[in-house]
From Swiss-Prot:
Residues 5-242 form the tr-type G domain. This is Elongation factor 1-alpha 1. The modification N6-methyllysine is found at K36, K165. It is found in: Cytoplasm; Nucleus; Nucleus, Nucleolus; Cell membrane. SUPFAM superfamilies: EF-Tu/eEF-1alpha/eIF2-gamma C-terminal domain, P-loop containing nucleoside triphosphate hydrolases, Translation proteins. Residues 194-196 are annotated as: G5. HAMAP family: EF_Tu_A. The gene is EEF1A1.
């Protein structure tokens, strides 16, 4: 078997008809976790429904439908392999909650794959149409997804087919606008593909002899290749933040007979070990971790990315809840935020937002109403330069620095210290109206909280 491949996460973005599903479906279909039987079943259904041209989007539609219905399908279906990596597609924007997911992200994407359609008139539509394409790329960048690959799709439907001129025109245009957002085009692989026919997906295409391959220049090592799969293989591997202090936002807290209280969540930074004394914020409860489990197996340590359950002593289910954050009591323990300063981008709000606006924030696993206490400055959303001091209101498209105050105790961190706890979605009217990253947190000095007997004992023993 040799060494296990590194796991990486990608997010696929682009306009609604750019062919994201077909392209993604193709990769999953050819390199992925879908077994022969499932594919044959899909093909048979497709034929019966007269969707003989089934190909790949159908695979994805089936998976999506199951995901939407809340059937937890085998997540391996959303995985595929390159020669170096196991790749998981953490989301594709067809989903209703795409933006929210991307922010409260069950996980951070290591790379975004932007699909643009080269077809006549299609590219223009995707880029202008209140530019979903721009919106997604801007979001990816704002939320810290610094690596980008661009797939110029549907090369088979250009005029004439596989037109070099059309491809070059698109590369030029896309380079210009990703540069405005903050990406450096030299570090981005551009690949002309057809997700439908398979051109340059896994094998170099015979239809584009003019394409001499993609090249990227970056300080961590240059790379070149021809296909989309090779470009994915050249993503720089993520550095998982094991050296930071522990932060583990709770997803749930269970009471398990014979064991006791078991909080469950994903380690975002740091390491969780049995015997550690942890503090939960904002409730300010400190206790000892008796054991740590993943998939019903005891672990000697849990690392960033691991979804774990851990048993804590002398803590009742009433003491801690979803949205609380666990950390090491001796190493920068998490604290309640009295307030925080954030940079927000208003995405779609029908009216005007002024000081006093109090929507719900989704930040890590917390879901809490927060007040826009003060609109400090309006800024250029790309460069971050100040445009105006103390604006009276904000509307769609604006970016601003805002002071926020949570309506109930909550624990958040600055994006630069703990990225997963420093980005949030602003929800109102059943949609994401804004996104933000936290610049600074005003932490509440914790009074004497509850320290359990086992924690006192563990601390004495040390």
């Amino acid at each position: 078997m040799g060494k296990e491949k590194t796991h990486i996460n990608i997010v696929v973005i682009g306009h609604v008809d750019s062919g994201k599903s077909t392209t993604t479906g193709h990769l999953i279909y050819k390199c992925g976790g879908i077994d022969k039987r499932t594919i044959e079943k899909f093909e048979k259904e497709a034929a019966e429904m007269g969707k003989g041209s089934f190909k790949y989007a159908w695979v994805l539609d089936k998976l999506k439908a199951e995901r939407e219905r809340g059937i937890t399908i085998d997540i391996s279906l959303w995985k595929f392999e390159t020669s170096k990596y196991y790749v998981t597609i953490i989301d594709a924007p067809g989903h209703r909650d795409f933006i929210k997911n991307m922010i409260t992200g069950t996980s951070q994407a290591d790379c975004a794959v932007l699909i643009v359609a080269a077809g006549v008139g299609e590219f223009e539509a995707g880029i202008s149409k209140n530019g979903q394409t721009r919106e997604h790329a801007l979001l990816a960048y704002t939320l810290g997804v610094k690596q980008l690959i661009v797939g110029v799709n549907k090369m088979d439907s250009t005029e004439p087919p596989y037109s070099q001129k059309r491809y070059e025109e698109i590369v030029k245009e896309v380079s210009t606008y990703i540069k405005k957002i903050g990406y450096n085009p030299d570090t981005v692989a551009f690949v002309p593909i057809s997700g439908w026919n398979g051109d340059n997906m896994l094998e170099p295409s015979a239809n584009m002899p003019w394409f001499k391959g993609w090249k990227v220049t970056r300080k961590d090592g240059n790379a070149s290749g021809t296909t989309l799969l090779e470009a994915l293989d050249c993503i720089l591997p993520p550095t998982r933040p094991t050296d930071k202090p522990l932060r583990l936002p709770l997803q749930d807290v269970y009471k398990i007979g014979g064991i006791g209280t078991v909080p469950v969540g994903r380690v975002e930074t740091g390491v969780l070990k049995p015997g550690m004394v942890v503090t939960f914020a904002p409730v300010n409860v400190t206790t000892e971790v008796k054991s740590v489990e993943m998939h019903h197996e005891a672990l000697s340590e849990a690392l960033p990315g691991d979804n774990v359950g851990f048993n804590v002593k002398n803590v009742s289910v009433k003491d801690v809840r979803r949205g609380n954050v666990a950390g090491d009591s001796k190493n920068d323990p998490p604290m309640e935020a009295a307030g925080f300063t954030a940079q927000v981008i208003i995405l779609n709000h029908p009216g005007q937002i002024s000081a006093g606006y109090a929507p719900v924030l989704d930040c890590h696993t917390a879901h809490i109403a927060c007040k826009f206490a003060e609109l400090k400055e309006k800024i250029d959303r790309r460069s971050g330069k100040k445009l105006e001091d103390g604006p009276k209101f904000l509307k769609s498209g604006d970016a601003a620095i805002v002071d926020m105050v949570p309506g109930k105790p909550m624990c958040v961190e600055s994006f630069s210290d703990y990225p997963p706890l420093g980005r949030f979605a602003v929800r109102d009217m059943r949609q994401t109206v804004a996104v933000g990253v936290i610049k600074a947190v005003d932490k509440k000095a914790a009074g004497a909280g509850k320290v359990t007997k086992s924690a006192q004992k563990a601390q004495k023993a040390k």
